[in-house]
Amino acid sequence: MLKRNKVVLVGAGGVGSSFAYALTIDNSLVHELIIIDLAQDKAKGEVMDLNHGQMFLEKNIKIEFGNYDDCSDADIVVITAGLNQKPGETRLDLVGKNTKIFKEIVTSVVSSGFSGIFVIASNPVDIMTYVTMKYSNFPTHKVIGTGTTLDTSRLRYFLAERFNVNTQNIHSYIMGEHGDSSFATWDETKIAMKSLSEYLAEGKVSDAELDEMHKNVVNAAYEVIKLKGATYYAIGLGIKKIVNAIISDQNLILPISSYINGQYGNFVKDIYIGAPSVVCKDGIKEVLDFTISDRELEKFKISASQLKSYIDKIEF
């Protein structure tokens, strides 16, 4: 008998429901999706709405409202619950409030007997991923955050628009905090087989343009929040990408929130931060400790140190 893959989603807000929708229409290998939320009517409504579209799907998926007991035999628990950014707030402003929420959620999930993989999308995601690891006492490779996957997708979109190519032909990453201290790996960026440094040397793009592009990545969430109140479609797709990489054992490289403990120059230890990593059925197979330029390494140090300063203030 074939194994039935089961995912539990904790949080039926904009991000959670966008992920649930993306997963449902993706024809993935997930067979069962359980949705949990304190706002039970909201969660039940999302379940009903998704189920009413089953006729239009290539493959039906069992979707139900549930509780933490349903986590006991789940392969993956996705957490999107928590307070969202308000206009004018940074992601780091949410640390104290969401840490309290996560303590209750994570301990409830673990109490069910869950032994699968956590995927965290709540902000500030790098810190909430660390909080999940601490409260669950899970191995670090079994706790994953969405990290800078969304930031990287935004960057590749902007680069693709600028160079008039498909996003699949852009090879570049945003690393560091999913937030204001992130940085672009310009020195390693390629458009298909051609390095960005070659375009700069030829005068086909300028450093000023690239700086503006990174500012647009950093400010994207603030702009979307100002216009529509929250971001959820793109991150919903990002979570789905991570979940499918785990379920399908893809060995896919994504800039997720990974546990760093001495990589990239041994300058900061014991944090989660956005770094390209191999995602497989066991979670994080490997954090890719590849060489980045000195100027980018300095930005990574600054970003990591900022996250570490917040983590050190949390009492576990």
Curated annotation (Swiss-Prot):
The modification Phosphotyrosine is found at Y222. Keywords: Allosteric enzyme, Cytoplasm, NAD, Oxidoreductase, Phosphoprotein. Pathway: Fermentation; pyruvate fermentation to lactate; (S)-lactate from pyruvate: step 1/1. One of its GO terms (biological process) is lactate metabolic process. NAD(+) binds at V15, D37, K42, Y68, G82, L83, A121, S122, N123, T146. It comes from the Bacteria. The keyword NAD applies. Gene3D superfamilies: Lactate dehydrogenase/glycoside hydrolase, family 4, C-terminal, NAD(P)-binding Rossmann-like Domain. Its EC number is 1.1.1.27. One of its GO terms (cellular component) is cytoplasm. InterPro entries: L-lactate/malate_DH, L-lactate_DH, L-lactate_DH_AS, Lactate/malate_DH_C, Lactate/malate_DH_N, Lactate_DH/Glyco_Ohase_4_C, NAD(P)-bd_dom_sf. It is found in: Cytoplasm. Substrate binds at Q85, R91, N123, P124, V125, D126, D151, T152, S153, R154, T231. Its main location: cytoplasm. Beta-D-fructose 1,6-bisphosphate binds at R156, H171. One of its GO terms (molecular function) is L-lactate dehydrogenase activity. Allosterically activated by fructose 1,6-bisphosphate (FBP). Belongs to the LDH/MDH superfamily. LDH family. This is L-lactate dehydrogenase.
